[in-house]
A protein has these predicted regions:
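N-terminal glycine-rich FAD/FM-binding segment characteristic of electron-transfer flavoproteins
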Residues: 1-314
């Protein structure tokens, strides 16, 4: 929510317009108008208003952070094959879980139909628990169905952190979940930390971020999400201190898969989705695969690229 202008008190003096660093205010007919899409509730305008004509946005209802536990990875699968980025995130999530506490678990969320066999692969790449949601309506990805199902899971089990791959599915899916949970989402993260001391070490070695105000002995374990900003010219670290779950997307290939532990086991929680055909607005008639099997660039360790100047294959 944005700030509120009290019309009876506003004089149209434009002091608030000059104070706003986000260009979220303008004057029309001697009245301040708020662009809610730009307002970040920084409240810089409130301090400048001489007529007490601006009210701060009401604070959101406080969330009991202690009720949220464990790290979830959306184990994206397509046509019965888990995407590599999900396995990479299981490895990263396992590291974060150890840094939070000995009791924090790394869990995979598998959504689809007839995919129970994929749980074993999740265990072998680090998952301790798999939430398995199966239904014929979930055979192919649809925004409506997957969003409803994962939101139901989050409401029931309350994870502290949810990680998604920044694929075309993850980028469509994750923002909707975050909006419905009234929480934040950081896209295209390149580094994740929960321990302040580890974050300080990373920031000093790899960025120009100012860490002078941070205490390396701070016991808090909120996730610090680092990602490029302004076209990659700067690195920004984003936190989500007031809401849960904390959510991030990570591009394929950014994190490292842990070494596969053949035969590893864990707990499978079968979840019956509260889903009907009426919940899904998209009707998938057919899925046509490419006639020629292509190699996914997201799975490649090394990519060689060249223009016409190369001349020939040599």
């Amino acid at each position: 929510m944005a700030i509120k202008i009290i019309k009876d008190k506003c004089k149209g003096c434009s002091l608030c317009v000059k104070a706003c660093p986000f260009d979220a205010l303008r004057i029309e007919n001697r009245l301040a108008i708020v662009d809610e899409g730009k307002c970040t509730n920084c409240n810089a305008c409130i301090a400048k208003c001489k007529f007490d004509a601006i009210e701060a946005a009401p604070e959101a209802e406080k969330v009991d952070l202690s009720a949220y536990k464990h790290i979830w990875v959306f184990a994206e699968q397509r046509q019965g094959k888990i995407q590599n980025v999900a396995l990479e995130l299981l490895g990263e999530g396992k590291k974060l879980a150890k840094d939070i506490s000995d009791d924090t678990q790394i869990c995979a969320v598998l959504i689809g139909d007839d995919i129970e066999n994929l749980a074993q692969e999740c265990f072998e790449y680090g998952a301790e628990k798999v939430y398995l949601v199966q239904d014929p309506l979930l055979k192919n990805y649809t925004t409506d169905a997957y969003t409803k199902v994962l939101k139901q899971l989050i409401d029931e089990y309350k994870p502290e952190i949810v990680l998604y791959g920044a694929t075309h599915i993850g980028r469509d899916f994750a923002p909707r979940i975050a909006a419905r949970c009234n929480t934040g989402l950081t896209a295209d993260c390149t580094h994740l930390d929960v321990k302040v001391s580890k974050y300080i070490e990373f920031a000093k070695a790899n960025t120009t971020l100012d860490t002078s105000t941070l205490d390396p002995n701070d016991p808090s374990t909120g996730i610090k999400q680092t990602r490029p900003a302004f076209g990659g010219n700067l690195m920004a670290t984003i936190i989500c201190p007031k809401t849960r779950p904390q959510m991030s997307t990570v591009r394929p290939g950014v994190m490292q898969k842990q070494e596969r532990q053949a035969g590893a086991t864990g707990e499978i929680i079968n979840v019956k989705p509260n889903l009907t055909a009426a919940d899904i607005r998209i009707d998938i008639k057919d899925i046509v695969k490419s006639a020629k099997e292509m190699v996914s660039l997201t799975d490649a360790d090394i990519i060689c690229s060249g223009g016409r100047g190369l001349g020939d294959a040599s």
